[in-house]
From Swiss-Prot:
GO terms for biological process: muscle organ development; myotube cell development involved in skeletal muscle regeneration; myotube differentiation involved in skeletal muscle regeneration; negative regulation of myoblast differentiation; negative regulation of myoblast fusion. The gene is TMEM182. This is Transmembrane protein 182. The keyword Cell membrane applies. Glycans are attached at residues 47, 102. Belongs to the TMEM182 family.
Length: 229
């Protein structure tokens, strides 16, 4: 009975981990950024450029924000304009700087982002393989497949942990947003570009938790079957 309960919760946590990882992988809201279009101390309305990016795409669109409105709601699907500009995120690794980058720092950023992208792809592959192994293990009660699936879930959790850690380093250091901020403030002293982590970013830690938990449960199941059968 306890073995069946462990398998059930392992499958539940594994499914949640897979779902969260795939949504985080496929959505383009890892980073949310706003950039002022013009500054005016006399008006309460500002034209702002909104940026959001993920693994595949980086998109931006223009909007108007009133003084008491929150910029974050402009990124909600229903509040976005019907058309917006998008480019491949790998080819444009900075959330702002379209054509305004230093070639050396840009090349380094592309390499760093490429490494981050490879880790994310490996994490997605690992969690899909883990799910396949667990599905195959269930009919045969194979301790080897359960342990292999559990190990793959743990590997996926570790890989996505590295993805999250590298993305934080990316935003805080590698993207060199401070230089861009200083450049823009020459024209607009009263405005600082805003950069926030998006909901896609926060899905990844939740997926990591469920993936690691599922992996540990399936390892225990595999060891239990090996010892008692």
């Amino acid at each position: 009975m306890r073995l069946n309960i462990a398998i059930f919760f392992g499958a539940l946590f594994g499914a949640l981990g897979v779902l969260l990882f795939l949504v985080a992988f496929g959505s383009d809201y890892w980073l949310l950024a706003t950039e002022v279009g013009r500054c005016s101390g006399e008006k309460n309305i500002e034209n702002v450029t909104f940026h959001h990016e993920g693994f595949f795409w980086r998109c931006w669109f223009n909007g108007i924000v009133e003084e008491n409105d929150s910029n974050i709601w402009k990124f909600w699907y229903t509040n976005q304009p019907p058309s917006k500009n998008c480019t491949h995120a790998y080819l444009s690794p900075y959330p702002f700087m379209r054509g305004e980058h230093n070639s050396t720092s840009y090349d380094s950023a592309v390499i760093y982002r490429g490494f981050w992208a490879v880790l994310m792809l490996l994490g997605v592959v690992a969690v899909v393989i883990a799910s396949f192994l667990i599905i195959c293990a269930a009919p045969f009660a194979s301790h080897f497949l359960y342990k292999a699936g559990g190990g793959s879930y743990i590997a996926a959790g570790i890989l996505f942990s590295l993805v999250v850690m590298l993305y934080v380093i990316w935003v805080q250091a590698v993207a060199d947003m401070e230089s861009y901020r200083n450049m823009k403030m020459k024209d607009c002293l009263d405005f600082t570009p805003s950069v926030l982590y998006g909901w896609s970013f926060f899905l990844a830690p939740a997926g990591i938790f469920f993936s690691l938990l599922a992996g540990l449960l399936f390892l225990v199941v595999g060891w239990h079957i090996q010892i008692h059968h």
